């Protein structure tokens, strides 16, 4: 199956994404009853090891690419796909519109990747810190920001860097990144330390679904299986009721902001409860 996907990728990004829809996996999993328990988390990690072929390593999340090639033409523009580019721009616009930040706000983006939102917010005059596991992504963000005379503070590390930060932020953003966290409960709790009074945490374009097959677990659609098996990425999905419960247990309340015409770009906005 991976061979067929790779062949589709050689044709175009659209063909690659169409190939993802041709397969998925259905599993009858006997998961521990308490989704907040360490036993449950261990079961998810065991499922990952079975799907990927070896236990999870944080280094799997790092992306290797040729920096110079993507400074001027980063993802999604590099795909040359009208659908992919259009959807991505819609999702980014939804984030910026939902944030609606006051001038000069402090923003932290976890898993900033290609830097599309980070650089856009920096161009708007916000003070942006971008954290990513990949040094190459950090270098790319700096190069892209420099091209537009914007300033971004980049840091290389994983989600655990939340415990090393000394600043507070008006907004903390996860865009297609929260679902890569192997210990999301601890992360949600730790965010309180760095959120400014009245600040918000945004979970944007994250796989949070009413009818997800488990409270939380690895996604079993074609694209996720490909990403787990080939790249070793951690690809979680969340049932809405579980996600809301996890937020509540961590001291957050949240509301959903729907993206018209693109459900995959819906946003959950969390604030301190009470």
Per-region residue spans from a language model:
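Conserved beta-strand/loop positions that form the S-adenosyl-L-methionine
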Residues: 110
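A short acidic, Gly/Pro-enriched loop at the edge of an enzyme's catalytic core
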Residues: 163-172
């Amino acid at each position: 199956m991976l061979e067929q996907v790779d062949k589709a990728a050689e044709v175009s990004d659209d063909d690659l994404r169409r190939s993802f829809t041709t397969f998925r996996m259905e599993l009858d999993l006997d998961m521990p009853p308490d989704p907040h328990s360490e036993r449950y988390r261990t079961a998810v990690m065991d499922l990952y090891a079975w799907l990927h072929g070896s236990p999870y390593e944080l280094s799997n999340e790092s992306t290797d690419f040729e920096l110079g090639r993507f400074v001027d033409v980063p993802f999604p523009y590099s795909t040359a796909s009208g659908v992919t580019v259009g959807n991505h721009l819609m999702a980014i616009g939804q984030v910026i519109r939902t944030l609606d930040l006051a001038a000069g706000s402090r923003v932290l983006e976890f898993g900033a990747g290609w830097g599309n939102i980070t650089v856009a917010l920096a161009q708007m005059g916000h003070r942006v810190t971008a954290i990513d596991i990949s040094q190459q992504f950090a270098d790319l963000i700096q190069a892209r920001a420099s091209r537009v005379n914007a300033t971004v503070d980049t840091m290389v590390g994983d989600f655990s860097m939340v415990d090393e930060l000394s600043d507070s932020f008006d907004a903390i953003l996860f865009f297609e990144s929260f679902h890569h966290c192997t210990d999301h409960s601890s992360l949600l709790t730790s965010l309180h330390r760095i959120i400014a009074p009245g600040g918000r945490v945004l979970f944007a374009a994250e796989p949070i679904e009413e009818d997800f097959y488990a409270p939380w677990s690895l996604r079993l659609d074609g694209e996720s299986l490909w990403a787990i098996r080939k790249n070793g990425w951690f690809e979680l999905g969340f049932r809405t009721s579980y996600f809301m419960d996890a937020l509540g247990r961590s001291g957050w309340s949240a509301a959903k902001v729907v993206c018209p015409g693109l459900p995959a770009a819906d946003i959950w906005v969390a604030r301190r409860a009470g």
